[in-house]
């Protein structure tokens, strides 16, 4: 009976002990400013994606004309948006690393967006150049990488928008 009594006493004693209260996490004013910049800049994400996909598809179907310039300008806008949001997002992610509330959501969002960052850079590098031949292969590769990157970024965006805590 002694081992059973000891096991029951240990089990009940473990239940009586309360866990330490969660530590408060305090964010800096700079965190709040970066979060606001990140959030407001993010409003441009989906409209830029829609514009770029429409321009890219039009250019894919009928190469040439002013569409190429417009496509490059919108692409530069996406690159600029992602530069700003990568800096503000990573910086805030580092500051929020000790806050357990919403950690998984922030991590999933961050990983998806960093993967999209890499994809957008690869998209830029894979842009077709009609002067050096193999135009059709390059544009297909460029398109595939771009659409994959947009999908990753949209998933990351929606994770923060609808992901809950």
Please state what every model-predicted region is.
Residues 1-73, 81-103, 163-165:
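N-terminal targeting leaders of membrane proteins
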């Amino acid at each position: 009976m002694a081992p059973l009594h000891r096991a029951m006493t240990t089990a009940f004693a473990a239940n009586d002990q309360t866990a330490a209260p969660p530590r408060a996490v305090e964010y800096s004013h700079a965190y709040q400013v970066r979060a606001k910049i990140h959030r407001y800049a993010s409003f441009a994400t989906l409209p830029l994606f829609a514009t770029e996909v429409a321009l890219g598809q039009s250019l894919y179907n009928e190469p040439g004309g002013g569409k190429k310039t417009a496509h490059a300008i919108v692409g530069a806008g996406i690159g600029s948006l992602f530069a700003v949001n990568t800096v503000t997002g990573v910086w805030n992610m580092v500051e929020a690393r000790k806050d357990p509330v919403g950690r998984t959501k922030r991590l999933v969002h961050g990983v998806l967006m960093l993967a999209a960052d890499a994809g957008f850079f690869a998209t830029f590098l894979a842009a077709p150049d009609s002067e050096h031949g193999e135009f059709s292969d390059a544009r297909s590769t460029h398109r595939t990488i771009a659409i994959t990157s947009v999908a990753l970024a949209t998933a990351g965006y929606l994770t923060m928008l609808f992901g809950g805590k």
